[in-house]
């Protein structure tokens, strides 16, 4: 997170992935593109960008890297199951209201691209009794147009 007292504020987002081919004798591939370094850590009002915005940027960047990796896989490398090191739902509640829908739409578009590339996406449930599980189950039962 940017330090408001630093001489030169910045932040970086580092994304990595591991491709494991179940049943194959090939060793897993690791992929770590150059980090996304941001020297403009201020929002439109000149305030330091919030940790919530950085988290959303990271989550979107993870899906973009995942899509890039999916498009590089051999055609016979199916089925593909992806596991994100976080919850599946994008946390936008901490963003300013006017950004929430925009970021959610970006996230859904990226998830659609993952699906169009023939992959399934999974995350983890860190609190099984939380409302996240119920919310995801409710979303799963809706038609795509209703989401």
Named regions from a protein language model:
Residues 40-147:
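Long, contiguous domain-sized segments
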Residues 1-47:
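Acidic, metal-ligating active-site segments
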């Amino acid at each position: 997170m940017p330090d408001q007292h630093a001489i030169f504020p910045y932040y970086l987002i580092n994304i990595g992935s591991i491709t494991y081919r179940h049943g194959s004798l090939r060793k897993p591939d690791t992929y770590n593109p150059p980090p996304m370094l941001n020297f403009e850590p201020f929002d439109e009002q000149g305030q330091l960008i919030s940790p919530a915005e950085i988290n959303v940027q990271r989550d979107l960047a993870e899906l973009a890297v995942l899509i890039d990796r999916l498009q590089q896989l051999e055609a016979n490398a199916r089925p593909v199951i992806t596991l994100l090191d976080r919850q599946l739902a994008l946390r936008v509640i901490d963003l300013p209201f006017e950004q929430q829908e925009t970021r959610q739409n970006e996230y859904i578009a990226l998830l659609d691209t993952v699906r169009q590339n023939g992959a399934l996406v999974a995350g983890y449930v860190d609190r099984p009794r939380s409302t996240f599980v119920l919310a995801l189950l409710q979303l799963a039962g809706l038609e795509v147009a209703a989401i």
